[in-house]
Amino acid sequence: EKSANEVGLKSDVIRYPDSVEEKTVLDKIYELNKDNSVSGILVQLPLPKHIDKQKVIEAILPSKDVDGFHPMNVGNLSSGYESSIPCTPLGCYLLIKKIEPNLNGKKAVIVGRSNLNGKPMTQLLLKENCTVTITHSKTKDLKGECLKGDIIVAAVGIPELVKGDWVKKDAIVID
């Protein structure tokens, strides 16, 4: 909220106790969907266990889905259409593009297959004509896969998983 205000954006934070009923959350989302003064909705994950995360995500209008988690936005991103993009992969992508504007033909290794980071990052790099290999913490010879990458993005929630000797000279690494 503070960061939004600092850059001139209006932001309202709606907090609920962990005991909140799913219906209460869904009703608020439906209300915000109808409100033309609301341009975006972001639901802080994880949700309490008794609330169906997918139901909540799907209740948000795709046009107001700040995180890019709605199935329509996920599908649009993977099909190359305009969509909301999750902020972490988008930030990584913009950083990579600042370092190397021409990604055409680069070999990218994504360590992580989550819907939040790994899969969207893969789609963004595929759109740039990278050859993308998706790996994860259980990949056999992860070091060998990483050594092939011109770009390595580690997004598995394990700090410093990618070691220095896993990276070839001049590779771009985001961990």
Segments predicted by a language model, with ranges:
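Short, hinge-like loop/turn segments at secondary-structure boundaries
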Residues: 30-31, 59-60, 150-153
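Anion-binding alpha/beta catalytic cores of soluble intermediary-metabolism enzymes, centered on
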Residues: 42-107, 121
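Glycine-rich phosphate/diphosphate-binding loop of Rossmann-like nucleotide-binding domains
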Residues: 1-2, 18, 83-172
